[in-house]
């Protein structure tokens, strides 16, 4: 009898594993939203908690308020603000991880300079990470991993990007054997073409993409007008060069890409940006942007010992691989993986912050997972706010937890994004309630 039960249990586990391996991009089955069954876990002294987070406004690359501001200055602004807000001595930090995509060496030198500009002593170590568009979230995962393995009890996870001042589109030195592998060759497909591939392969119409983009703009405009971003944004005073080359001092205090006057008619007039007859336009794609964000994490016991606030708890993190030529579908596979690790379903989540690299891929992921539209990016996403590559993941964490705090009740939220070359990342956070 016990042998039969053991075989049944083993078969069940095998079916679960096969279920995760199935449902890849070729499958048409969607993740079904199960009835809400969330039970909040007991607080543990070993929990990795988010203490606090801040971000800069997001500037329009090449023409906005940060077009002449170096990334070390953007990063220093948020590092300084987070430490000052919670009155934490900088020498208490066990490590700093900074996500960056476009700077040489993932911005390792730039980030260390920013550390010193922020008054953080040389005794605090720092590393840089580049997992493309998930770099900011990967920094969060890296710091959380260090806390979990006992390397330290408190650390700072950041993301930063100056797309104004960085060289985009150069893959670096690569093998002459590239043509021998379809997947290797697909890693060089322009991101806009991967968006077109998703739209064509999964039937995401131009009208649906434009409607999604309009909703993003409308939500962001509403949030901005209500002051919803005020608590998370660090105003940055900087200098900008005018058309004559003269320096002017300005203070950037809100996101520059939000366009309240956006209409479906206006979006419909935009030409395809990446190929003739395509459906991906400047209006239904993320904006090229500048910005930085920082998130302070700690072991719960250390946060309590230091009298620090607890804004959220990191419950799970997952990264998955998908075909490079349709890289935008990554969240559709990363989110279920992260939810499973947390023991949750789609219905248990109040807010999904899914990066809007392109409306095509964001829509695909939302529809594939059966996520109610009202749960997706309630304050707008990258189409309206902008997408400073290395910053985005950290920015999403800050925005998510601040919005859950505004709502007040205990709840779960998800941060997710697609990743160039074919990946997706997702993390589940719990807001503990007011």
From Swiss-Prot:
Its EC number is 2.3.1.16, 2.3.1.155, 2.3.1.9. Disulfide bonds: none annotated. One of its GO terms (biological process) is bile acid metabolic process. Optimum pH is 8 with acetoacetyl-CoA and 3-oxooctanoyl-CoA as substrates. SUPFAM superfamilies: Thiolase-like. Coiled coil: none annotated. One of its GO terms (cellular component) is peroxisome. PROSITE patterns: THIOLASE_1 (PS00098), THIOLASE_2 (PS00737), THIOLASE_3 (PS00099). GO terms for molecular function: acetate CoA-transferase activity; acetyl-CoA C-acetyltransferase activity; acetyl-CoA C-acyltransferase activity; acetyl-CoA C-myristoyltransferase activity; palmitoyl-CoA oxidase activity. The modification N6-acetyllysine is found at residues 183, 244. It catalyses: an acyl-CoA + acetyl-CoA = a 3-oxoacyl-CoA + CoA; 2 acetyl-CoA = acetoacetyl-CoA + CoA; tetradecanoyl-CoA + acetyl-CoA = 3-oxohexadecanoyl-CoA + CoA; hexanoyl-CoA + acetyl-CoA = 3-oxooctanoyl-CoA + CoA. The keyword Transmembrane helix does not apply. The keyword Aminoacyl-tRNA synthetase does not apply. InterPro entries: Thiolase, Thiolase-like, Thiolase-like_sf_Thiolase, Thiolase_acyl_enz_int_AS, Thiolase_AS, Thiolase_C, Thiolase_CS, Thiolase_N. Pathway: Lipid metabolism; peroxisomal fatty acid beta-oxidation. It comes from the Eukaryota. The active site is at residues 133, 387, 418. Residues 11-36 are annotated as: PTS2-type peroxisomal targeting signal. Keywords: Acetylation, Acyltransferase, Fatty acid metabolism, Lipid metabolism, Peroxisome, Transferase, Transit peptide. It is found in: Peroxisome. The PTS2-type peroxisomal targeting signal, which mediates interaction with PEX7 and localization to peroxisomes, is cleaved following import into peroxisomes. Belongs to the thiolase-like superfamily. Thiolase family. NCBIfam families: AcCoA-C-Actrans. Responsible for the thiolytic cleavage of straight chain 3-keto fatty acyl-CoAs (3-oxoacyl-CoAs). Plays an important role in fatty acid peroxisomal beta-oxidation. Catalyzes the cleavage of short, medium, long, and very long straight chain 3-oxoacyl-CoAs. Medium chain straight 3-oxoacyl-CoAs are preferred substrates. Homodimer. Interacts (via PTS2-type peroxisomal targeting signal region) with PEX7; leading to its translocation into peroxisomes. This is 3-ketoacyl-CoA thiolase A, peroxisomal. It comes from Rattus norvegicus (Rat). The lineage of its organism: Eukaryota, Metazoa, Chordata, Craniata, Vertebrata.
